[in-house]
Amino acid sequence: MLKASNSKQTSKFYDLEERTYKFAKNCRNFVKKLPRTISNIEYGKQLIRSSGSQAANYIEANEALSKKDFVHRIKICKKEVKESRLWLRLCNISNSNTTRKEQKKLIEESIELTKIFGAIVGKSK
């Protein structure tokens, strides 16, 4: 866990394991709202797999037996988040502004997670 602020009243902690879990959960909930087209069904399945994989691999990275294994798992996390972004971009959301905003928010989160995982890899070398 990384400590984000040191205010007197509240200390905010960033738990990356929780953040990756929420990203996967939010992607799953997003898929449930998509129009049921053939392409959305397939893209949705891929999105659920890749977003879940980044969360699972982050948990595995935290249990790594070696630094090499840790870095490898984090690289997989980064790859899976980038893949999730592709599937998010490919989903056809029709005219729903709410779903469009949710899609944009998830894409932004995937960009942030990609940067975080990239920084972890860079600092671990």
What function would you assign to each model-found segment?
Residues 1-125:
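Amphipathic alpha-helical assembly/interaction segments
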